[in-house]
């Protein structure tokens, strides 16, 4: 019987262990940031251990970065974590994309942009959205601080092999529907736990026709569906994305010959298989307090089916039967490792251009990396957003999570292009609605959610 992409990647990296038991995997790339690395570095010091492979470790600042003024760090804990990463990287010989560096940004954007993320690798990071890197035909997953220390010391990690799931996605996306809507649809349909215990491969016509940035959006949220890993087979689109980047292989043609073997064999079988027709999708909006609680734009919010729904409605200040258009928005956030890439900003700017943010909305655009910010400014996107009344910020995780100054006030509804809508995720009492960048942009200039499939409703002015 043939092998799945996941089987091939996993088998390449097993150092020790029997099938059915935890196995020791070799780690090709360890990405770190300021929040989950200090304890691990301190553990090395206490045991007087060296960092085994500094050359396979790369650091950046993202979670705590104040995006209004990156050097004005008011929070003492955040400042201490940032200073600790600077000290630790210098002491242990780790390359750091420091504050203000041309390479600084959200860790899951910096890896691909620099060419560190490549097909065939096992990539780990102390962050749950490490599945993003699976879009390149890699195994990427998040780890805890104790595991970060283990990788520091050994360049390996113990893992129980998950089962395999294949999600076949075919059909052309309708106008106004994006990669973000695909993953929100999957989670709303099958739940936040359907991927638990699985490594998911997304494939099919729809995936083949996507850019790398769109593919990363889908893999980024594999964890929201319960899966530890999400991945896609590398193809010519992947190879051309990697080609010419700072850390791309010196012999690309040799690398490509190897990468071309990283695909599921025709006679391979997944432990679970799901099919999806992308041509019938609508723009999605979440109404509740986990990504499963989402609906197509044309649908009303569902009836209460259990205590979780009851609590979610109470927290969000909403009721069954309401629609997304009725939500009283106060904030719009375009950013995060899910949707802060150049193509995301270009699509948002296309909708925003020539319009104005409504008076009831505070709107932020936070590029995911310095590279994206520079590229956006080179083609005038910053001017489009600023002329419309958006705040144009420095790169960082920003309003995706309440760990920096960018937070949504208590009780305020926010249209967000991020990946999680948990209680308090964007700040104490914040009410988060997950959407695509286009939906967020249209909401900012209309003052509420609209059906972006109807061009006539995209109009601005205060």
UniProtKB/Swiss-Prot annotation:
Pfam families: Aconitase (PF00330). It catalyses: (2R,3S)-3-isopropylmalate = (2S)-2-isopropylmalate. The keyword Iron applies. PANTHER family: 3-ISOPROPYLMALATE DEHYDRATASE, HOMOACONITASE, MITOCHONDRIAL-RELATED. Catalyzes the isomerization between 2-isopropylmalate and 3-isopropylmalate, via the formation of 2-isopropylmaleate. Belongs to the aconitase/IPM isomerase family. LeuC type 1 subfamily. This is 3-isopropylmalate dehydratase large subunit. It comes from Listeria innocua serovar 6a (strain ATCC BAA-680 / CLIP 11262).
């Amino acid at each position: 019987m043939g092998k799945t992409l996941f089987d091939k990647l996993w088998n390449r990296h097993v150092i020790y262990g029997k099938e059915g038991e935890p196995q020791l995997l070799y780690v090709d790339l360890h990405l770190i940031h300021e929040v989950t690395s200090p304890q691990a570095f301190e553990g090395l010091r206490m045991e007087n251990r060296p960092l085994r492979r500094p050359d396979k470790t790369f650091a950046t600042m993202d979670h705590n970065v104040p995006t209004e003024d990156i050097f004005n760090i008011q929070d003492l804990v955040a400042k201490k974590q940032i200073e600790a990463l600077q000290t630790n990287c210098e002491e242990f010989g780790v390359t750091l994309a420091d504050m203000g560096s041309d390479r600084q940004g959200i860790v899951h954007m910096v890896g691909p942009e620099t060419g560190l993320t490549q097909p065939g690798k096992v990539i780990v990071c102390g962050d749950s959205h490490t599945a993003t890197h699976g879009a390149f035909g890699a195994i990427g997953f998040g780890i805890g601080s104790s595991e970060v220390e283990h990788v520091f010391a050994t360049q390996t990690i113990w893992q129980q092999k998950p089962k395999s799931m294949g999600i076949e996605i075919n059909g052309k996306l309708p106008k106004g529907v994006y990669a973000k809507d695909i993953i929100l649809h999957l989670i709303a349909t099958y739940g936040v736990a359907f991927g638990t215990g699985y490594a998911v491969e997304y494939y099919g016509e729809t995936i083949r026709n996507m850019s790398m940035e769109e593919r990363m959006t889908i893999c980024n949220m594999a964890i929201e569906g319960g899966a530890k890993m999400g991945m896609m087979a590398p193809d010519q689109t992947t190879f051309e994305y990697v080609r010419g980047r700072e850390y791309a292989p010196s012999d690309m043609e040799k690398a490509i010959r190897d990468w071309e073997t990283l695909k599921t064999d025709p006679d391979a079988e997944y432990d679970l298989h799901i099919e999806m027709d992308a041509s019938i999708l609508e723009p999605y909006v979440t109404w509740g307090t986990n990504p499963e609680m989402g609906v197509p734009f044309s649908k009303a919010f569902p009836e209460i089916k259990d205590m979780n729904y009851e609590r979610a409605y109470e927290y969000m200040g909403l009721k069954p039967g309401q629609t997304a258009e009725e939500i009283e928005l106060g904030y719009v956030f375009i950013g995060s490792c899910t949707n802060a890439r150049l193509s995301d900003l270009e699509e948002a700017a296309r909708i925003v251009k020539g319009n104005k943010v409504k008076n009831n909305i505070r709107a932020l655009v936070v590029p995911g990396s310095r590279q994206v910010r520079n590229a956006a400014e080179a083609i005038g996107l910053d001017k489009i957003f600023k002329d419309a009344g958006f705040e144009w910020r420095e790169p960082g995780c920003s309003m995706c999570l309440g760990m920096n100054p960018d937070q949504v006030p208590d009780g305020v509804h926010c249209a967000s292009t991020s990946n999680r809508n948990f209680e308090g995720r964007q700040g104490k009492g914040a009410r988060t609605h997950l959407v695509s960048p286009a939906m967020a942009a249209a909401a900012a200039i209309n003052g509420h959610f609209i059906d972006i499939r109807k061009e006539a409703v995209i109009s601005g002015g205060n």
